[in-house]
A protein has these predicted regions:
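Cytosolic regulatory/linker segments at or just downstream of nucleotide-handling modules
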Residues: 185-187, 194, 207, 213-255
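Catalytic core of nucleotidyl cyclases, primarily class III adenylyl/guanylyl cyclases
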Residues: 68, 99-153, 160-204, 228, ...
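Juxtacatalytic helix/coil linker segments
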Residues: 2-111, 126
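Short amphipathic alpha-helical segments
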Residues: 32, 89-94, 159, 207, ...
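Short, well-ordered loop/turn elements at secondary-structure boundaries
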Residues: 60-62, 181, 213-215
């Protein structure tokens, strides 16, 4: 009887470790810990309430934000069967995933051919504040500089790495368009089903705009990034409508 109980306990412990490992491949470890703590507290109180995801939200400062996508992906998909496209994307994103640890980068998500990553939210130099505090902003100059340098290095490695992955059928290298920005954001989980870790804020929107208005095989960065990493060979972009609307001066880095 005792032997059977011990076996059940060991099996339960093993399953819990597997579940946590699986969750930590989807959500940041700190978020998983908070979710499990909520669940444990409700179990002790014999409650069965829904997870309160709003309590997990945090405000981050000095964050580097990256958006990257494939040039000509839509036309490529029309020429190649879906399975080959999926294999190609998996091979390419595996390269990017492997680079994350080298540069203190956290992959937030992939949406189709778009790859979103940050430094300073889960990894890197973190400056965190409760979302309820809005009347002060912590000093982040050192953290911003460190995070921006790591993100620029990661972006360069992404462009180099993408050139090594060939598109099926066409046999041409993948070309990236990369956008970078630095600033603040709010992180958290929205909703109570199909949990997804998300970033929100104006600076996230600007990073996405840097990618959309970028140049193939180059890194398109806001002036805020350039000021933090001035040692790179940045070239000021021509003023275009998107830049005027957002009020952001931007620069290109050839890789």
């Amino acid at each position: 009887m005792v032997k059977q109980q011990n076996q059940i306990i060991r099996e339960k412990s093993r399953n819990e470790r597997m579940q946590r490992h699986f969750l930590e491949n989807i959500l940041p470890a700190s978020v998983v810990e908070k979710l499990q703590l909520q669940q444990e507290q409700w179990s002790l109180q014999l409650q069965h309430d829904k997870i309160q995801t709003s309590s997990i939200s945090q405000r981050h400062f000095g964050v580097g934000i990256l958006y990257a996508d494939l040039v000509g992906f839509t036309s490529f998909c029309k020429q190649v069967d879906p399975f080959s496209v999926m294999v190609f994307l998996n091979d390419l994103f595996e390269v990017f995933d492997g680079l994350c640890d080298d540069f203190n980068v956290y992959k937030v998500e992939t949406v189709g051919d778009c790859y979103v990553a940050t430094v300073g939210v889960v990894t890197g130099e973190q400056t965190v504040q409760d979302v309820s505090i809005t009347d002060s902003m912590p000093k982040t100059s050192t953290a911003s500089r460190t995070n921006a340098k790591d993100l620029v290095s990661f972006a360069k490695a992404m462009v180099w790495g993408s050139r090594q992955v060939k598109k099926p059928v066409l046999d041409t290298p993948a070309l990236l368009r990369v956008g970078l920005h630095t600033g603040s954001c709010i992180s958290g989980i929205i909703g109570t089903r199909n949990f997804k870790f998300s970033l929100l804020g104006d600076d996230v929107t600007i990073a996405a705009a840097m990618e959309k208005t970028g140049v193939p095989d180059c890194i398109h960065a806001s002036e805020d990034v350039v000021k933090l990493v001035p040692e790179e060979r940045w070239e000021k972009c021509k003023v275009h409508e998107a830049a005027v609307q957002s009020g952001v001066t931007s620069f290109l880095l050839s890789v």
